[in-house]
């Protein structure tokens, strides 16, 4: 694609996103907001209308003269599937074209499950979603998948996902050949960051840092409207940032990684260590420790379990150190905490903020908001929906 065509597609996506953000909006207001001349906006919106992605929806108010025609995104033009392929779960949503969820499914998978079994489960849940899809003008437009690892985005190959024990898995090709639909693959934290930008209520934030805390830890960085990817597209692997020289070996083969101290896995390990040392209460004790998961610990903390509260505070403390480093490096306007950590409650958030504001040098000069995701565990799946829309519109063959 030449530069002119690329710029046209970027502007087209920018206009579509602006309409999506405002629900209904006039061409004149779009022109002011995106800093494009009225003729360009008119031509591109007319193309979007012809293609079925935008519709005219009544008239706006006018202080004098002709009332402006209002535009809105055609939510029923087609459907999108977003998938968060986690280490111990698969989370899928089927949405309309504005990200409203029509059908949703969570499927647990066993930790350490073989690649073939995980793919089999993925195909089963995809088949269920496709069967559940209602008829629309363009049908299912694409499938977006977020994966916890390093992804070569253009080819859709999972180069390395240490917590899944995957290496060089051509996931895009495998899913496309099975279902005959366009497939878009990215790192789950990048997808989560995009989900927050598009659907999380942070559309006006220029510099957003999303930190996904589950079995592993990853980060997605949004600058302007774009996810920052680095030289080869591998930026954001903050879970493998070294914060200790002498710790146990991480799943990646390194030692002292942040994941070893501040992830869901670290929380479970810490609870077991506490119980083995005799620290127990009615919720967390020798009778419950072997069967519990992170969800149980979080619920116990919300029920005022001292053991669970102490463990979550410790995790927040260590995660805060990692995030303080990221704040110093990237200087974001906001840090959004997602995935499992978004359910950890006020105690977790208060301690996390305390550490970030104490240790991040730049917070003396620039206030950085630290928030939990309003999307909770849907940031990645909705980000995958946004990824399908944005990647699809980046190429002229999508219609």
UniProtKB/Swiss-Prot annotation:
Function, in words: Transcriptional repressor of xylose-utilizing enzymes.
MF terms in GO: DNA binding; DNA-binding transcription factor activity
Full protein name: Putative xylose repressor
CDD domains reported in the protein's UniProt record: ASKHA_ATPase_ROK_BsXylR-like (cd24076)
A Gene Ontology biological process term: D-xylose metabolic process
InterPro entries registered for this protein in UniProt: ATPase_NBD, HTH_MarR-typ, ROK, ROK_cs, WH-like_DNA-bd_sf, WH_DNA-bd_sf
Assigned keywords, A-Z: Carbohydrate metabolism, DNA-binding, Repressor, Transcription, Transcription regulation, Xylose metabolism
Protein family per UniProt: Belongs to the ROK (NagC/XylR) family.
Covalent S-S links between cysteines: none
Gene name of the encoded protein: xylR
DNA-binding region positions on the chain: 27-46
């Amino acid at each position: 694609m030449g530069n002119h065509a690329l710029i046209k597609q970027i502007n087209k996506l920018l206009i579509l996103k602006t309409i999506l953000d405002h629900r209904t909006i006039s061409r004149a207001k779009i022109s002011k907001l995106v800093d494009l001349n009225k003729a360009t906006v008119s031509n591109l919106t007319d193309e979007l209308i012809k293609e079925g992605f935008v519709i005219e929806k009544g008239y706006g108010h006018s202080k004098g003269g002709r009332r402006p025609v209002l535009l809105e995104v055609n939510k029923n033009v087609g459907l999108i599937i977003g998938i968060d392929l986690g280490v111990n779960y698969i989370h899928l949503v089927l949405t309309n074209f504005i990200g409203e969820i029509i059908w949703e499914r969570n499927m647990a998978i066993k930790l350490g499950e073989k690649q073939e079994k995980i793919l089999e489960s993925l195909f089963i849940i995809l088949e269920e979603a496709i069967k559940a899809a209602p008829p629309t003008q363009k049908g299912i437009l694409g499938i977006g998948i977020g994966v916890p690892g390093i992804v070569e985005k253009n080819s859709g190959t999972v180069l390395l996902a240490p917590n899944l024990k995957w290496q060089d898995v051509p996931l895009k090709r495998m899913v496309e050949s099975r279902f005959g639909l366009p497939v878009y693959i990215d790192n789950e934290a990048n997808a989560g960051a995009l989900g927050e930008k598009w659907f999380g209520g942070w559309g006006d934030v220029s510099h957003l840092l999303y930190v996904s805390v589950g079995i592993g830890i990853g980060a997605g960085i949004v600058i302007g409207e774009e996810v920052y990817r680095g030289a080869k597209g591998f930026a954001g692997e903050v879970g493998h940032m070294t914060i200790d020289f002498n710790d146990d070996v991480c799943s990646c083969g390194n030692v002292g990684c942040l994941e070893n101290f501040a992830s869901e896995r670290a929380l479970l390990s810490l609870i077991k260590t506490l119980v083995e040392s005799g620290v127990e209460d009615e919720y967390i004790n020798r009778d419950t420790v072997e069967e519990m998961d992170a969800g149980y610990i979080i619920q116990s903390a919300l029920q005022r379990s001292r053991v669970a509260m102490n463990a979550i505070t410790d995790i927040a403390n260590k995660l805060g150190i990692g995030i303080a480093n990221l704040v110093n490096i990237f200087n974001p306007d906001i840090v959004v905490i997602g995935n499992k950590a978004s359910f950890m409650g006020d105690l977790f958030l208060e301690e996390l903020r305390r550490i970030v504001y104490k240790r991040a040098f730049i917070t003396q000069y620039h206030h950085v908001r630290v928030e939990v995701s309003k999307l909770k565990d849907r940031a990645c799946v909705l980000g995958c929906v946004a990824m399908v829309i944005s990647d699809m519109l980046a190429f002229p063959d999508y219609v």
